[in-house]
Amino acid sequence: MTDYLPFYPALADQLSQRGIDVAQVKTRLKQQHIETPSWGYGDSGTRFKVFPWPGAARNIHEKLADAAYIHKLSGIAPSVAIHIPWDKTDDWRALKQEAQSLGVQIGAVNPNVFQDVEYKLGSLCNPSSTIQEQAIAHMVECGEIMAAVGSTILSVWLADGTNYAGQDSFSERKHRLEHGLRATYSHLPAGSRMLIEYKFFEPAFYSTDLPDWGTAYAMALKLGDQAQVLVDTGHHAQGTNIPAIVSFLLDEGRLGGFHFNSRQYADDDLIVGTVNPFELFAIYHELVSAGDKAANVAYMIDQSHNIEPKLEAMLHSVLNCQAAYARALIVDRKTLREAQHGGDVLAAHRVLTEAFETDIRPLLAQVRKEMNVPTDPMAAYRADDYSRKVAQERGVAQGGQGGYPG
């Protein structure tokens, strides 16, 4: 384990010479908030196979305990997204209190309108009005759960789509989608938001009813100010410029939040920042550049850890987001603007690469020291016996015990 704290004074001096307010950077890093997903602590994976992991959380109570442990190590993961019905309980207020007693809180509520056999042909867009109403009722129920646990975000992703030309009417499906979203939107708790997620394909392969940011944006505009777009970084076609999408939605006031993960080919749900760390940095650069327009953006992990240790994968994800944010905060924006306005293409690019290539580990170590969390959270995790203890106590979960299908 390398101690990076002795290198902090030199880095702080270097950043100050670039015109960076180091104290302000540290303040911003201490305010960072990354929400972890309950399903990321249980056994989850691909459509081909879910491999069980010793100690993986089997229920919402164990998921909350694991999330609290990740927050204890990182200091920046104070909330947990839940998925209904995977995390359903008989007493939501008691669950809220349980989370608070562990030092975390319930975050976004995610409806599940894709798993039941009734949703084979879609949920809100299903040709059957009975199934449409079933999906709406479930989403309204999730709004009631939000009120009970104090959540302010309903995170909506639909698997709806078609596999063959002529299977259904595109325009009729669009009308059903709008009707279902409006019905759900009308039941949102006061002060809350609906974040509309998109995905360009899978599980449907010919058409998807919410395939891209433009469709999600159009639906949000139809619904009202409480509706915004959720960007899942793995839900795009190869080569899509996600930072540009982020910038547009920020400027329009319609970027609601993120589901962070990494992808190599499709919706791979790999650890965020592992496949393309520069893209993650570029996304955070747009967020920092947007200033107050990014104040209410929600940052959430959405990953299925299939072959990785659940806790270590989650901690790795949170720390990668922290590192990307730190690099974005040390961009010399004054020099960048001068180069951009002067048409100096490569000088502008070098401003970004200089920040990206800066070794920010001493800065992060100093911030963590001031937050009273381990200066090297991963080393602390590896040295701790928490994962070994829960593996002994929980054993290996039986198929589907944690809620995730498979």
Set out the residue ranges of the language-model regions:
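Catalytic domains of carbohydrate-active enzymes, especially glycoside hydrolases
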Residues: 26-40, 52-86, 102
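Surface-exposed, active-site-proximal loop segments in enzymatic domains
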Residues: 48, 115-133, 158-171, 309
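Short, acidic/polar
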Residues: 53-70, 136-144, 239-248
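Long, hydrophobic/aromatic-enriched structural stretches that serve as scaffold segments
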Residues: 99-121, 142
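Active-site groove signature of glycoside hydrolases
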Residues: 142-168, 192-197
